A protein has these predicted regions:
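A residue-level marker of the well-folded mature domains of exported/periplasmic proteins
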Residues: 1-125
Length: 125
């Protein structure tokens, strides 16, 4: 989300060193990461995997994933969540039901609230 701004700032301030957290070369939109930038990325899929695995091991079988925007970090987390949940379900010999949705924003609104309430009501019946 901030890649273009980082590329601009790195060009404007070549003597300044920038550290960009959760930014990749693809986010920057240039052929290479500027020499005065250091990009650090998390392995979101690993955190997501552990979350999905743990919730199924805790006995939950009706799950939901709501990602804000479908940006690479959120997508990786979501995929990890599904993979972890599936791995735990296979170990337990059980079936799971996962609702999966991207809200297209990083804030709530009436439409997202309604969808989440629908998921909750579906899981209670």
């Amino acid at each position: 989300m901030y890649g273009a701004s980082l590329a601009w700032a790195a060009d404007q301030y070549p003597d300044v060193k920038f550290i960009a957290v959760d930014v990749t070369q693809g986010d920057i939109g240039t052929d290479a990461i500027p020499a005065n930038c250091y990009c650090i990325t998390f392995k979101e899929e690993q955190a997501g995997y552990l979350a999905g695995y743990a919730i199924v091991k805790d006995g939950k079988t009706k799950l939901g994933f709501l990602g804000g925007m479908a940006v690479p970090a959120v997508i990786r987390y979501g995929y990890g969540y599904v993979q972890g949940a599936d791995a735990a379900a296979q170990e337990l010999g059980t079936n799971i039901d996962i609702n999966y949705f991207y809200g297209g924003q990083f804030y709530g609104d009436a439409n997202i609230t309604s969808r989440m309430e629908g998921w909750l009501n579906k899981s209670l019946h």
